[in-house]
Regions:
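AAA+ P-loop NTPase nucleotide-binding core of proteostasis motors
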Residues: 1-336
Length: 336
């Protein structure tokens, strides 16, 4: 005889109300309490940005926000590859809500903006609905990420103004979509190119405020005025890159673990990967490319056709200034 327990009821209620299952049973105080630490554990070198974001979310969850607005409207600014999108992704995981992401490079033309709220009656695609309005209708509790917002057509900003101010949007059918339980995050690289330039003479230390000037140039006053916070992200230092190397290696260990392969990487090899992949202007992305090119590609050959097809151990070290791989087939040693 099957019995229905509390967890089953919570899941059904969560589906009907379209809210995260976690929010049904537990107060999210514990989640908010550890929010800052949880984010710092997975995104490195952005302590100030994470602190500002966590404080802003706690403020809104404490009931001190205006009830008709979204939970928060945040603009993440900073150079490429420093963790802006990753913070939004990890925030959705920590809060247990859906991440709804739109790349604004797809909405550079005026006509493409109508895809977000749906085409008006009489136009092609009227029956399909808007991508943004449909997504929020299906996931009213979510982190809405608009990536590289500066690439979007100016008409999109006019649509966002009402969302940021009143927490509602009307789609092409006249249906009102509720944004009041949405955390709206927009990312921008505005000013990153200015920050990358070397300052002349005594102005060398004053580069940190340049992205504010670029944001002021790029976004209208009424748009900036509706933001809860502009959260600047700093470039990654060499010390932070070494921690990112550790993160990539841990991810690789998990991937290899599924194939019964263990990995050992010496400190010299870790330092080599870090120095090879460090570029202060491009953040962690060059590092990911170095790991893929110099570590994953040689391993892929061995996993598919070589000495790791049945599992084993791989030791990575430095030899003659390059990475060297030493493979041990555990099956062979066990039988011997």
């Amino acid at each position: 005889k099957k019995t229905i327990n509390v967890k089953d009821v919570e899941e059904v209620v969560a589906k009907i109300a379209r809210i995260p299952p976690k929010s049904v049973s537990t107060d999210d105080k514990n989640t908010l309490l550890s929010l800052e630490q949880d984010l710092k554990r997975v995104v490195f070198g952005q302590d100030n940005a994470i602190q500002a974001l966590a404080s802003a979310i706690k403020l809104s969850r404490a009931g001190l926000r205006e009830p008709e607005k979204p939970i928060g409207n945040y603009l993440f600014s900073g150079p490429t590859g420093v963790g802006k999108t990753e913070v939004a992704r990890q925030l959705s995981i920590v809060l247990g809500v859906e991440l709804v992401r739109f790349d604004m490079s797809e909405y550079m033309e005026r006509h493409s903006v109508s895809r977000l709220i749906g085409a008006p009656p009489g136009y092609v695609g009227f029956d399909q609905g808007g991508l943004l309005t449909d997504s929020i209708d299906q996931h009213p509790h979510c982190v809405l990420l608009l990536d590289e917002i500066e690439k979007a057509h100016p008409d999109l900003f006019n649509i966002l103004l009402q969302v940021m101010d009143h927490g509602k949007m009307t789609d092409h059918n006249g249906k009102k979509v509720d944004f009041r339980n949405v955390i709206l995050i927009m990312t921008t690289n505005a000013g990153a190119s200015d920050l990358a330039k070397e300052a002349v003479g005594f102005g060398r230390t004053q580069r940190s405020g340049d992205d504010t000037e670029a944001i002021n140039r790029m976004f209208s006053p009424e748009f900036r005025n509706r933001l809860d916070a502009v959260i600047p992200f700093a470039g990654l230092s060499k010390e932070i890159i070494s921690r990112v190397v550790e993160k990539f290696i841990m991810q690789l260990e998990v991937q290899l673990g599924d194939r019964n392969v263990s990995i050992e990487i010496s400190e010299e090899a870790r330092s080599w990967i870090g120095s090879k992949g460090y570029d202060k202007n491009f953040g962690a992305r060059p590092l990911a490319r170095v790991v893929q090119e110099h570590v994953k590609k040689p391993l892929a050959e061995e996993l598919l056709f070589g000495r790791l097809t049945g599992g084993g151990l791989v030791s990575i070290d430095i030899q003659d200034g390059e990475l060297s791989f030493d493979y041990t087939n555990t099956k062979a040693t066990d039988s011997g």
